[in-house]
């Protein structure tokens, strides 16, 4: 039974999106053709894939192509593909709603910069709506492969918040999108203009894009259209061509197509691998992190082809999780055409591809990081700013390549008076003082908190460099990265901190004397802070601050405890050790105070100040304020 004519309303987010397209992206009008051609290409990829299991879907028409035709009299532009097509329900769902959950994020990402916003359209899978930038009415006629000719559908909208759906007859499988151009958009009726846009954005599309052939009419001094169709793009899969035949511009255009990104990539690698597994890889390092890099539902992974037949997007099994930001294509000669995601998990060939792709990406990063060319090193700095935290995950996730990943890590450090993470572990080791056999670091919520940590005072005094770690992933990473180049990584907030040869004999003697002189005060302090501090002791690691908190050997740091609690996870209740600076005026007064409220209040203030200095939260801020006020009175 033929479905009736229906008028339906767009989803609210689509209305908002249409308004954006029409009113905010007018200076990037030509992107509409890029997006519609990309969608048409995807439709043919889907048909190829479904036809593997059901060849009848090809309907005796295996010559897959995209046709673009302008009609100057009617002022229309048609984009036709003979791909998978859509059923009535699919047309309503795909063209009337935004299915994905990222709608809110899409609008939050909009910056007002038209070029950047235009790139987001493709990233969010809403490229179809860009047609309304140049058209005041859009008509879509489509029939899904496998359905009868009478089961085709016409979808139409003027972009005003509603669309109509009608049943029609259509002999051809696939989709035709007709754009009824707005006044002033006649530029897009020019064959030359359309060809230039196609060659700019879509030359790499692996199926032919055809337009009516035009020949020069000398009498009329103009080009005239013929009944023939000609291909206006290369129409071959870029990765199958020889590297020497591909320009940087073509590599960049292909990246922009698969990544839906207007920016050029930082680097790429293109290789044909032969051996146990035979495959071609074309991998890119983007210049900017996607908005949802840290979203659990983020779709990551490479495009997978088998013998040039598209199999799936987002084949996350081809790269480890810490490289989820890599874009590109893998074309395997060994995998079966009916490969499933489940089969990918178990395949030995996929394991070999994964290992090979991982090594290639790490090699690209090493080339940028170690380059003598300042521009290349600047690219690595850009990469690190965008993806450094993700790369740190590799220290724990990829034991086989841990050493290579560790060499690529960058940190802020007391060597530079800047929050920029630009210090490599190898550079730190190269600057170590004579007698130093450890790499020292401090963790904190912010660079300022790390730089001003009381734990750094003795290191500043001795001129010892300390790494300043402020990323949430750092504590987790350090649980796997115990040493580098034979040097142990040690937190300056450890209670059992041993400077080894960096501490002279006089300092050791002074420490022993202080412990003896303050024995009585320390015993009283331990009694006051019982249940709050694991221990109280004097220290010479402080030169300016009155007190600091340190963690006992084997205990979780206060910083990591806070991170776990913020993430809603249970953290072990490890009490810190309070260390007091015996040379500080606030601490010296403890010796003159008898047991009682005044002694207890001053000691509690010293504990709370140390907790605040390391970024901790007070259990009772009001009590702290009262104690401080007493001291100030």
UniProtKB/Swiss-Prot annotation:
Enumerate the HAMAP family for this protein. HSP90 (MF_00505)
In the record, the note on similarity to other proteins reads: Belongs to the heat shock protein 90 family.
**What Pfam families does its record include?**
HATPase_c_3 (PF13589), HSP90 (PF00183)
* Record protein name field: Chaperone protein HtpG
- Tell me the InterPro entries matching this sequence: HATPase_C_sf (IPR036890), Heat_shock_protein_90_CS (IPR019805), HSP90_C (IPR037196), Hsp90_fam (IPR001404), Hsp90_N (IPR020575), Ribosomal_Su5_D2-typ_SF (IPR020568)
Region (B) location: 342-562
Q: What does this protein do?
A: Molecular chaperone. Has ATPase activity.
What are the entry keywords? Answer: ATP-binding, Chaperone, Cytoplasm, Nucleotide-binding, Stress response
* Subunit structure, interactors included: Homodimer.
Give the CC-aspect GO terms: cytoplasm
State one molecular function term (GO). ATP hydrolysis activity
Q: Where is this region: C?
A: 563-633
Which residues span the membrane? none
A: region residues: 1-341
